[in-house]
Structure formats: C-alpha cells, structure tokens
C-alpha cells in the first residue's frame, strides 16, 4: 500500500533527526485517491448509506485560528464583546481548547493560512494586516508561534492541517515576485525545521480570484510554486504534499492537476448539490488527472438537516468536504467560524448541524 510505503519513507528520511527530537505523532500520506494517517486509511472500514467514507478527509475552514491585525487603524474592529479589545493569544487559545471536541465528532482536518482570510466572511476591500509573511518574504515570529501551537495540537489529536501560504486579500503585503518565492521557501523550511508530518500545503487560496497582485500566484503560473515546494522539500528529505485551490464552482486547470498531489475545490456560490457532483466528475476528466484525492475545503452552503446538500453530494461522489461558516449580516457573536472575533464553541444551530451530520457520516460519536 502506498500509504504505508510513504510513511516508511518519510520516517526513514528523518530517523536521525527524530532520535534527537520528539517524534511527531501524526503522519499524513496518500494512497491513490485516498488519505491515510499513520499508514492507515482514514475512517477505516466506514460505509455510510452505501457510500465509502474510508480514505476521505472531512475538514473545516478555520483560518482565523491565528488571526491578528497589524494595522492600528482597523484592529479595534475585532474587539471581543466582553473585554472591548482584541487579543490574538486568547483567540488561538480558545481555538485550541475546542479542537478535541471537533475531533471527537469526526473532523480530521482544518484549513489555516499564513495570510488568513476575510475576518468579515466576504469583503470588498481588506485594509487590515493579517500576514505571517513580511514584505520581503521573511516570516513573523509571533504569528509562527501561534501557528505552531495549533499544528502541535493537531498532531497530538491525530489531525491534519491544510496550510495555505497566500491569500488574495493580503498578497499585496509582499513586495514582489522574489519575495513571494522567498515566502514559500521560508514556509517550507519552517515546516521541515518543526518536523511536521501532518501538514498538507495549499500554495494559495483561490488562485483564480482576480484580486491577486503577483502573477506567480495566478492560474497560469501557480504550478511553478507547487513544483517549488515539492522540489525544495524533497531535497531536504522531508517531502511535502502540495496543491492549490480555486474559487467556488471552478474546475482545476491541467497545469495544476499535472503537478499537484491532491486537488482542492470550493463550493461557494454552488447552490445546487448536483453541481457539486458535476464538479467532481469534471475534475476527474481534466488532462493530467490520475487517481488522487479531491477535497472541497471551503463551502458556505449548509442545509444540514435536509436529505441532500453540498456536503452529502460531495461524499456520495467520493470527495472530502469542508465547512466554511461566516457571520451573516445581522448575526451575533455566537455565529460563524470565519468572522472575527470568533466564538470557537459549537455555539450556533448551524455549527451544531454540521457536527451532527459529520458525526453521522463518519460514525465517530463524541
């Protein structure tokens, strides 16, 4: 089984270093179109309503776990209702406190990003400064400290982190293409230095969104960065699994499919579950496709109490699905995981609905 051979290869490559440092608990690998954790297929043996769940990676977009705002003109927007001020360390601590609960419901992966995502859910402009990547491509130590706490906890829990590097609302914080590439290299080097084996790399969030400033982050050239991550990590004997994502309803392009290890789709704007099914089918027909995992790691459509919804449609098509929950206009603090400040508890009917369905599908009961 490729899962096991990949696991053995990675452990062999790092055995000398691991002898001197704590060994990581969680290793993610891929066996054709299936995910494995520690050499075993995820949700091993699970069948739900006649549909195989084994090998899927059910996930949730949680990019605000490491959020901060370096813009003094906007930071006050994120004040907590109780303290009337923003606190990035409190935010990360409260996130980590909830991770065991999510895992018990069957959540195996979370999506993070070194440049976050809109703290409003959707935004026309994004003046806040939420980036672990500095203008010259170096990395912010305070941001990395928060990120390490989250990835460490995921490792302890047997969870995977889908780590995005760039986001279209913040990539302008990096001055030029050389700095963009430096940011990629520094992120890869940091992951390897930390000995992380539970991380999947997402080069950038929604490469086809026109807001990107740097050409190398756009669809025609983003494969260059995927190849860069793979080449650099292999050279350092710590191969990383890499891809990028596309905006809602978009099918990956051949240049990405040919070089990616897995494929990331988004369901935002996809109102009919049958379109989710079509997206998976069409993705499997793209030039360069071979058996490889297909994941939705962002979808803001719910209807979790209905017999059919985007999540169920993805699972039936044998694609993993990712929950994206933001605070809709007029909603309060208890709603959403994307909107800052975040109540990371299962504090709304929407959140409860997702975790109920997730538990049912995966067979994992809290």
PLM feature segments, named:
Residues 36, 40-42, 47-260, 266:
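Active-site mouth of glycoside hydrolases
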Residues 183, 199-200, 204-352:
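Extracellular glycoside hydrolase catalytic/binding regions
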Residues 26, 33-37, 41-89, 287, ...:
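Extended substrate-binding grooves/exosites of carbohydrate-active enzymes
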Residues 9, 29-30, 144:
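Generic hydrophobic-segment detector
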Residues 5-16:
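Bacterial N-terminal signal peptides
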Residues 20-27:
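Cleaved targeting-peptide boundary
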